[in-house]
């Protein structure tokens, strides 16, 4: 698939040079918006705006949304005011908000200047919500019904207004004060008799979120309940917007990427790897590397403290890397398992005792198994024929058991503490590592 995509990109590049615009249009309209956006991102030259003008209006808007920030910025700089207005008018309101949030001030002014009055007002209202909240990712383009409307009236409203809505599969029922009282689907409306009123077929037990709820919690609800859209209400239960499945998927991807970067001791980045400069990557990585280097000094201090003991049985020092490494791996296993469970809502801080008890039993089993394997290895290969071999083998193996127990308990407990006090548990995965703590 990637080879085919590269071939298409090169074909388009050649056709663009030869100014065969009709052929270009015929090729582009057969592609999906995401694939077209990928081609635009690979081209990245002054002719990109010219290629964009070839696209039909609706396809152009769908493609524009899929592009990265740099490509969008390049296109906007090449647009006339009229062209910019046409693109903005075709975008859903949440996509306009995303665009405004990512662009520099001079570009934002152009975008808002070309937007109509209602769009500007809505964008400004959505921008007031905190970053990473449900309000910041919701859209205000949805179908609203009244409980006294009939199925026939509802379907007529959907036909009349649905073309400008982001989704029409789920309709939201509100009272005269805009309070959310129920939901119904287009399927239910179509399968009902024309004279049946909405209040008879709507579902009243509505799952919704508040505008200030964290976006990660919102995205997780999509996973738990298989929603296509989720209503967003204010503190008085008034419907103010909805979050759609495409935005929830974006949030899950962003959060997963951020967690992976934090667990690898890298500060999160908004740009794709290939579009991030060397200095940009350096700035993201060096702070945590400095922290981890300093935390490693604790290990050195402990070893120095027991230098005299190690000098008397010098062979013990050769097993330190194995013990600390195994302890670090054991702690990492526990940390990852607990962090994942916390992220999925499977455990909370109130489950700490149960989690610690489970990890303690796991650590005993793992510790005894590894210690037994290690003892056999020491007796056969490492200490065979040496003085005090049995004593050294027992000391190393028992130390290994204790290290694994301590590492797993600390590795499972720290993420829960961090989650309780509002700190991202992923930060503790590397600062300091369970390996350092187990030492």
Question: What does each model-found stretch correspond to?
Answer:
Residues 255, 359, 435:
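Acidic-residue sensor for enzyme active/binding pockets
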Residues 429-436:
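Conserved small/polar residues in nucleotide/adenosyl-binding loops
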Residues 148, 258-406, 413-427:
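Alpha-helical transmembrane segments and their membrane-interface boundaries
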Residues 1-267:
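Hydrophobic packing positions in regular secondary-structure scaffolds
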Residues 36, 48, 60, 108, ...:
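Alpha-helical structural signal
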